[in-house]
């Protein structure tokens, strides 16, 4: 079940998700990010406009700094040989940042976010890891909206670093540095727009599938459009200043940037975006893909809720068969999220 938040209402978009744990608790977590419900967008716009004006106002003589801009201007003015125009130029730059935030924030009114997390396993530890990703996500989202008025690539890099194992913590636990065993969590976060554009970042999660209403099949999506990083915390960028403080399976050449944000567009009414965790489909079995495609075809004209539930019902029946043949160990938590263009 979603952690928090009502289903966002976007013109021309129908969405619904659900999750079934394999045990009492599970490592799957999904959440609707309803920006209008969670954040006071009008209040944030008003604050940004207020700060844009305040940052231009000189600090009265003898008064303490009112904000970080005042603080930095004081530092500039105390430096030897500083250019007299530098403090004013700095104030103008910081003011313009707030004006841009005020311009970007209104777009959140017509944006719906979706967060999917899959922590390896389906017990208490897995649930705790998924919860850590969730809590980190929302803490950093507050920072993003304060600083930029939208999500940026650096947001995802910070979440990735939070899930990495630090050298200090590993040593404190007495773990062998050569022991590669660790808890794994994948994450997919995307934002949907009314025109059918879905922009997302993927850390180790099975790639989305797109079902064409016209052709009744899953469409092939070029791999070049489906950027995917390893699961959270496994790969630290080599240009990150703290890279030596974390264990990393490999070093990435650079930090996440805008070119790593993948895009999928639902072109026609009835087209469906299918997000899922590997308890439903691991993204590799062609026969399983065909079965899911059949379920999708049989329910494609139904609302997103019914499509989601039909896919989960299929996955549960498949699990019942696995139990009958003694393969309980491959049963995992199941999450399905459907986004349909009306």
Regions found by a protein language model. Give the residues of each.
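Conserved N-terminal boundary motif of the eukaryotic protein kinase catalytic domain
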Residues: 14-15
């Amino acid at each position: 079940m979603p952690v928090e938040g009502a289903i966002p209402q976007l013109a021309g978009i129908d969405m619904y998700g659900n999750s079934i744990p394999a045990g009492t608790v599970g490592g799957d977590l999904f959440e609707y990010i309803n920006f209008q419900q969670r954040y006071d967008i009008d209040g944030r716009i008003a604050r940004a406009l207020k700060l844009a004006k305040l940052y231009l106002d000189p600090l009265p003589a003898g008064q303490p700094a009112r904000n970080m801009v005042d603080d930095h201007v004081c530092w500039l003015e105390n430096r030897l040989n500083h250019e007299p125009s530098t403090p004013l130029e700095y104030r103008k730059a910081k003011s313009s940042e707030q004006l841009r935030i005020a311009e970007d924030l209104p777009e959140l009114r017509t944006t719906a976010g979706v967060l999917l997390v899959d922590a390896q396993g389906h017990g208490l530890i897995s649930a705790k890891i998924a919860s850590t990703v969730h809590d980190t996500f929302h803490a950093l989202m507050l920072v993003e909206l304060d600083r930029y008025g939208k999500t940026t690539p650096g947001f995802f890099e910070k979440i990735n670093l939070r899930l990495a194992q630090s050298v200090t913590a590993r040593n404190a636990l007495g773990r062998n540095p050569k022991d590669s065993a660790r808890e794994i969590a994948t994450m997919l976060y995307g934002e949907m727009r009314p025109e059918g554009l879905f922009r997302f970042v993927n850390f180790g999660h099975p790639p989305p599938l797109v079902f064409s209403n016209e052709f009744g099949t899953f469409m092939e999506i070029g791999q070049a459009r489906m950027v995917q990083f390893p699961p959270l915390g496994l790969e630290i960028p080599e240009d990150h200043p703290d890279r030596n403080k974390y264990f990393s399976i490999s070093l990435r050449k650079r930090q996440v940037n805008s070119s790593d944000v993948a895009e999928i567009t639902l072109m026609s009414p009835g087209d469906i975006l299918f997000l899922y965790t590997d308890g439903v489909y691991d993204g590799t079995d062609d026969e399983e893909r065909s079965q899911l495609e059949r379920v999708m075809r049989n329910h494609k004209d139904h609302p997103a809720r019914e499509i989601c539930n039909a896919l989960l019902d299929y996955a549960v029946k498949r699990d019942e068969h696995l139990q009958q043949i003694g393969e309980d160990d491959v049963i995992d938590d199941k999450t399905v999220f459907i986004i349909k263009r009306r």
